[in-house]
Structure formats: structure tokens, C-alpha cells
Swiss-Prot record:
This protein's encoding gene: MIC60
Disulfide bonds: none
Alphabetic keyword roster: Coiled coil, Membrane, Mitochondrion, Mitochondrion inner membrane, Transit peptide, Transmembrane, Transmembrane helix
Organism: Eremothecium gossypii (strain ATCC 10895 / CBS 109.51 / FGSC 9923 / NRRL Y-1056)
Membrane topology designation: Single-pass membrane protein
Protein name: MICOS complex subunit MIC60
Feature: transit peptide: 1-14
Length: 496
């Protein structure tokens, strides 16, 4: 047991007095973790050794230290595997000692050495400015120390001194670890701070250069924009001033020209007045008599002009009326539109000078005839050929209507239609008053262009025959009225 304790203490001292690993300037976090692992291993090794020789320490280590129970169990299993050889050696020594005791007649009493016991009091670990990892380790160590001091363990003096020395070495190692960590942390902070400062300086220099380039480019752009705007504004202002100056010069030139022309006119008037004054008593002495003679000729010239205008209007009116009558006499297969001719006729009638009315207050015959002609010629006027053709188409119906009895019904109409087919169509002039003779006379008058006689015969018809011929009578009456009005206007124009 003593040899195993000595071996354990020796291993712990060797483990606690191992030289520190030389530091490297790089990998500070790795060194920090390695030192934390070493300190934790030393702490667990010391606690495991103490728990192997003291039950109270064993109980505190198992209850308060994480993974303490598992480590103690593994330690006991490992020691149990090493003990069988020693048990055999101890059994042999016990047999030898028992044989020696039996051989001795009177056994000698071995003195019992009583070693004084000392109460174990370990100081708490004080650490300031440690890292969070070491601070947790220090807190765990202080918890174990407080628990050991609370148990008031009484140990032999050499054991207590050995534990105190081991604890002191652990404290020294933790403090050295803390100091090295602080130094490495300061070194690492300084190196990283230098790197950060250098990188920040480089970044600031790059940003400064970029900002300087951007500002220079922006300044150039703003300068170019300002330059273009200034050039544009200057050009516009210069153009405006040039235009204003040009306008002022033109106005001044016009004023000077106007003044010069006024002076020239005044001088010319003076010259004319002077010449007139000179000639007034000479060749222009009878100028007033000449003026009165010219004034006496003015009414004669007006009358001549009025007569010429009247003759021209009468000539054009006669020509236009002759043209309209020629159109109506020529005829054709389509109705005649006289609107344009009537507009010209009305215009000439308005221009025509006429004598003043002295006896009658009513409108002149020419105006009445023109108004009636405008009213009658609004619709197209049928030609003589159209009237003749329409009358030829109307004759069979007139034959049928002439055979109808009074109040004829359907049978009467049918009978009249059949008998009308048996009648012979008369031609030429006939003196009888039957329907065939009347239609023959009307057709002959139309053929001979005697529209008034034909219309008179048609108007004198009675009954269904007159009713059937109403449309033809209207067309013939419109043509006859237009021709009559043209004759009236022509006669009135000839009397002017």
C-alpha cells in the first residue's frame, strides 16, 4: 500500500512538475485548450489520488466533481487487476511471519508507533482576470476545497503535508497557466489588433482611393455638366442679346428710313406746291373749269355703265333662258335637273338694273316669275319623250277604266279587263268623245309637242280614268308651268 501511494505521489509530482510546452506564436487557441486540458487532467489526477486514500475525500470527489464516480470506478477496477500478484507475495510473507511466531517460544512484543493526526485545511484558490475556462476550473477546485475543509479531515502529518504540497503545485500550475494564458491572450490580442489595424488601414486606404477616384470622377462629371449648362446658357443669352440688338438696329433703321421718307415727302410736297403755284397762273389757270366739266360728265358715264350692265345682264338672261328651253326641248330618257341653271338665272336677275316702280307697290312680275320658277323646279322636270312614253304605258289602263260600270266589283274589273283587250287602239285626231279618241288625241298632241292641248284633254277626263292619270297630269303640269314661266321671264326681260 505504501509503495503504491509513493508511486501515486511520485506520478502526481512528475505530472505536476512537467515542464511547460514551449509556446508558439501561432495557434494561440490550441495552446489555450491544451493547457486547459492539462490543468483539468492534473486536477482529476490529484482528486483521484486523494480519494484513493481517504473515504471522505472519495465521497466529496464522487458527489461534486463531474465524471468523478466513473473515474473512481475505473481506478478501482485497474488496481484490482494489479493486486493478485501482490496478494500472493503478502500471503507468503504472512506464512513466514506465522512460522517465525510459532517457532519462537516467547514472542517479542513489537512497539506500535502512533503518528500524530493533523486536520486538513486547504486554502481556496484566488484567481483574478482569468479566462472563462480557467474560471470554471477554479470554481470547481474551490468547491472541492470548501467541501474538504467542511469535512475537517484528520490525516497523518506526512500525508497532509504531501496533499498540501500537491495542492500547492496544482495552484501554482493553474496560476502559471493563467499567467501564460493572459500573456498569450495579450500577445494574440496585440497581434490580431495589429493585423486588424493594418487591414483596416489598408481597407481605409483602398476606400479612400476609391472615394477619391469617385469624387474626382463625380467632380469631372459635375464640371462637364456645369460647363455644358454654362455654355448653353451663355449661347442662349448671347443669341437673345444678338436678336435684341438686331431688333433694335432694325427698328432704328426703320425709324431712320421713315424719317428720311417723311422728310423727302415733305420736300416733294414743297416742290409740288411750288410748281403748282408757278403753273396756277399759266397752263393750269382753267383747271377749275376742267374739273366742273369732268364732274358734269360723271352722271353720263354712270348712266352708260348702268346701260352696259343692263344690256349684258339682258343678253346673258336671254341666252340662259334659251339654253334652258333648249334642254327642255331636247329631252331624253332621264328627268332634267335645272338647279344650277336656276341659281345662275336668279343671280343675273338680282344684278339686273331695273327702273324704279312708281305706280305699283307690289313686287315686279320678273320677281314673281323667278320665285314661282324656283318653287316648281325644285324637283327634276320630265322631258316630252318621258311624258309620251308614260302616256303610252297608261293607255291600256285607261281603256280598262273606261269600260268599268259604276260601283264595279271584282267581276266588273275582270270583265272590263277582258273587253279592253278586244278594243282597237285609235290613232290621230278624232272628233268623238269616247276614251279611245281622247287618248289618241292626247298622244298625237304629245307627238306634235303640243303639251298644253294634251294636258287640257287629260284634265277634262272624269271618273276612274282621271284618277288613273293623276300622276301623269302632275308631271305634265310641272313641265308646262316651267315652260310658261320661262316664256314669261323671257318676255319680261325683253321689255326692260
Amino acid at each position: 500500500m505504501l509503495s503504491s501511494r509513493a508511486a501515486a505521489f511520485t506520478g502526481r509530482r512528475l505530472a505536476s512538475t512537467l515542464p511547460p510546452v514551449p509556446r508558439k506564436k501561432s495557434h494561440g487557441v490550441r495552446r489555450l485548450l491544451a493547457k486547459a486540458v492539462v490543468a483539468t487532467s492534473l486536477f482529476y489526477a490529484g482528486g483521484l489520488t486523494l480519494s484513493a486514500y481517504n473515504d471522505k475525500a472519495n465521497e466529496l470527489f464522487v458527489e461534486h466533481v463531474p465524471f468523478g464516480e466513473e473515474l473512481v470506478e475505473r481506478w478501482e477496477d485497474w488496481t484490482s487487476l494489479r493486486r493478485p500478484g501482490r496478494r500472493m507475495i503478502d500471503a507468503r510473507r504472512v506464512d513466514e511471519i506465522s512460522r517465525d511466531f510459532r517457532a519462537a517460544a516467547t514472542p517479542e512484543a513489537t512497539p506500535v508507533v502512533v503518528r500524530p493526526l493533523v486536520q486538513l485545511q486547504l486554502p481556496e484558490l484566488q484567481m483574478q482576470g482569468s479566462s472563462p475556462v480557467l474560471e470554471a476550473l477554479v470554481n470547481n477546485v474551490n468547491d472541492v476545497v470548501v467541501a474538504l475543509n467542511a469535512r475537517a479531515l484528520e490525516l497523518p502529518e506526512d500525508t497532509a503535508s504531501a496533499l498540501s504540497s500537491v495542492y500547492g503545485e496544482i495552484v501554482h500550475s493553474i496560476q502559471a497557466l493563467n499567467a501564460s494564458l493572459d500573456q498569450e491572450f495579450a500577445t494574440e490580442v496585440e497581434s490580431r489588433t495589429g493585423k486588424a489595424i493594418s487591414s483596416v488601414q489598408e481597407q481605409l486606404e483602398v476606400e479612400y482611393k476609391q472615394r477619391e477616384l469617385a469624387l474626382a470622377e463625380q467632380y469631372i462629371q459635375n464640371f462637364e455638366v456645369f460647363k455644358s449648362q454654362l455654355q448653353k446658357a451663355t449661347a442662349e443669352q448671347l443669341e437673345t442679346e444678338l436678336k435684341a440688338h438686331e431688333q433694335a438696329l432694325l427698328a432704328r433703321h426703320r425709324n431712320e428710313v421713315a424719317q428720311l421718307s417723311i422728310r423727302q415727302v415733305e420736300e416733294f410736297n414743297k416742290i409740288i406746291e411750288k410748281k403748282l403755284d408757278q403753273e396756277r397762273n399759266g397752263r393750269l389757270a382753267k383747271l377749275s373749269e376742267l374739273n366742273s366739266a369732268v364732274e358734269s360728265l360723271a352722271p353720263v358715264l354712270d348712266r352708260l355703265e348702268l346701260r352696259a350692265v343692263k344690256n349684258e345682264c339682258v343678253t346673258q338672261l336671254s341666252t340662259l333662258i334659251s339654253d334652258i328651253q333648249g334642254k327642255l326641248s331636247r329631252g331624253g330618257d332621264e328627268p332634267l335637273d335645272l338647279s344650277s341653271d336656276l341659281q345662275r338665272l336668279t343671280l343675273l336677275a338680282d344684278i339686273l338694273p331695273r327702273p324704279k316702280r312708281c305706280c305699283s307697290e307690289g313686287p315686279a312680275l320678273l320677281d314673281v316669275a323667278m320665285a314661282e320658277l324656283q318653287a316648281k323646279a325644285q324637283a327634276p322636270v320630265a322631258s316630252n319623250e318621258q311624258l309620251y312614253n308614260r302616256w303610252q304605258l297608261l293607255q291600256p289602263e285607261l281603256k280598262t277604266t273606261s269600260l268599268l260600270p259604276p260601283n264595279a266589283g271584282f267581276l266588273g274589273h275582270l270583265t272590263a279587263k277582258l273587253f279592253s283587250m278586244l278594243l282597237f287602239t285609235k290613232e290621230g285626231f278624232s272628233t268623238t268623245q269616247d276614251m279611245d279618241a281622247v287618248t289618241a288625241r292626247i298622244a298625237e298632241n304629245l307627238r306634235l309637242n303640243k303639251l298644253d292641248c294634251a294636258l287640257e284633254e287629260a284634265v277634262n277626263m272624269k271618273g276612274w280614268s282621271r284618277k288613273s292619270a293623276d300622276a301623269w297630269v302632275d308631271l305634265a303640269r310641272r313641265r308646262l308651268e316651267v315652260l310658261t314661266l320661262l316664256d314669261v321671264i323671257e318676255a319680261e326681260v325683253k321689255t326692260l
